[in-house]
Design a protein with these regions (language model features):
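Cell-envelope and extracellular/periplasmic
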Residues: 1-291
Length: 291
């Protein structure tokens, strides 16, 4: 399943039917293009070793911060999050004050009318209705997409009630810019605790993929006070202090300035080794030692 990237202010019970989200697809050359590379190699190794079908839920959204994956109730208790709520509210109000809300409503009405005309023409010809029906959510305030808790509300909460074996969490790069590293020490551990509550499993295995080395600048690679290394340290400390978690190192999987490793296999393989050893209890030579 690939979950469409989206952020919403309120927790959702289901995925919107119009974009086909939440539908299982069998892995094939036609469907694999939408899958995370790391998740693919992770699932491939599990499948080969366990010889059972492996279901992967790909809920990924580039550029998010840890606070986008934590419940609003939890975030409201964190003093470091107050500036982010204030900033979001100001941006949303500015969008309304500039008349963008009314303009978006007019665009939606226009686009919907045009789509309905095409649908009627297709029906008259006995043809299938055209895809791409305008989604009202796409005409909402764009700042909602990055609302604190937004990604959790739209992409994780509809999965509530699903029984899962564990989670891999690969995020942190965007928290290394500006002052975004400051709340990370509180928000990142909260991701784990909140997800365990959502899936009603206080011991839910949680694989922490440490952010890769993604810059040729010496300061970002070797200066332990640089924010990228502060994030890695916090990921390490969270692993040390949180039971039933694993730390998957990806620092050496990158060889150029790209923010994500272009070598997906080592990261997926290491994640699978951790899962096989700790989640599935396979100890027959599968090495998964953490750093």
């Amino acid at each position: 399943i690939r979950i469409e990237p989206e952020g919403l202010p309120e927790p959702q019970d289901d995925f919107p039917s119009e974009n086909g989200a939440g539908i299982w697809n069998q892995c094939s050359p036609e469907t694999i293009g939408d899958c995370s590379g790391v998740a693919y190699f992770f699932g491939q190794r599990l499948h080969r070793r366990l010889d059972v079908p492996i279901g992967l839920v790909n809920a990924a959204w580039g550029g998010t911060m840890a606070q986008h994956w934590v419940t609003r109730r939890t975030l409201k208790t964190l003093p470091t999050m107050k500036p982010y709520f204030t900033d979001h509210e100001e941006k949303c109000q500015a969008w309304i004050d500039k008349g963008a809300e009314k303009g978006a409503a007019r665009r939606l009405a226009k686009d919907l009318k045009e789509w309905e005309m095409r649908a009627k023409e297709a029906e008259a010809k006995g043809e299938k209705k055209p895809g791409g029906k305008p989604n009202p959510r796409n005409y909402q305030n764009p700042n909602q997409g990055r609302i604190p808790s937004g990604a959790l509300n739209a992409m994780i909460m509809p999965l509530k009630g699903l029984t899962i074996q564990g989670a891999l969490f690969y995020q942190g790069e965007n928290n290394s810019f500006g002052n975004s590293w400051i709340p990370f020490r509180e928000t990142f551990p909260s991701v784990i605790s909140d997800w365990r509550k959502i899936f009603q499993d206080p011991k839910l295995p949680f694989g922490i993929i440490q952010i890769a080395g993604w810059s040729t600048r010496r300061s970002m690679t070797y200066d332990m006070n640089h924010h990228t290394n502060v994030i890695r340290e916090q990921q390490f400390l969270t692993w040390k202090n949180t039971p039933n978690t694993g730390l998957i190192v990806s620092f050496d999987a990158n060889s150029d300035p790209n923010i994500h490793p272009n070598r997906k296999y080592p990261v997926g393989d290491r994640s699978a080794r951790w899962a096989l050893s700790t989640v599935y209890g396979i100890k027959d030579g599968t090495r998964s030692e953490n750093p």
